[in-house]
């Protein structure tokens, strides 16, 4: 049986292959990284096959969110605020629709909360 790291890598590769097909339409992708304490999200525009440009980024380390953080651990409430902050920053740059790149993470918990927060102002 495969261990959790192998399953994560398989899931990540499967998600990235699906996104590669969708982002060929010119949509930027909303990429998510989660650590034990923080969650990070960024809107990335792919330029060619090997280059990419970060349009907007937000995390629980941003001053707007970090001052409200009661615990040094990300939860659903703060993940939703990160999604909302990222959506505002992307809208200010003229981005209205993105492709959600969850990486190898399951669409559950803080990943779902971040997506719901971003979905309030972005289309995906």
From Swiss-Prot:
Q: Which UniProt keywords apply?
A: Ribonucleoprotein, Ribosomal protein, RNA-binding, rRNA-binding
GO terms assigned for molecular function: 5S rRNA binding; structural constituent of ribosome
Q: What range does the record give for the signal peptide?
A: none
Keyword Thylakoid assigned: no
InterPro entries per UniProt? Ribosomal_uL18_bac-type, Ribosomal_uL18_bac/euk
Q: Which family does it belong to?
A: Belongs to the universal ribosomal protein uL18 family.
* GO cellular component: a single term: cytosolic large ribosomal subunit
Q: Subunit structure of this entry?
A: Part of the 50S ribosomal subunit; part of the 5S rRNA/L5/L18/L25 subcomplex. Contacts the 5S and 23S rRNAs.
Organism equals: Orientia tsutsugamushi (strain Ikeda) (Rickettsia tsutsugamushi)
- List the protein's name: Large ribosomal subunit protein uL18
Under NCBIfam families, the record lists: L18_bact
Q: Which PANTHER family match?
A: 39S RIBOSOMAL PROTEIN L18, MITOCHONDRIAL, LARGE RIBOSOMAL SUBUNIT PROTEIN UL18M
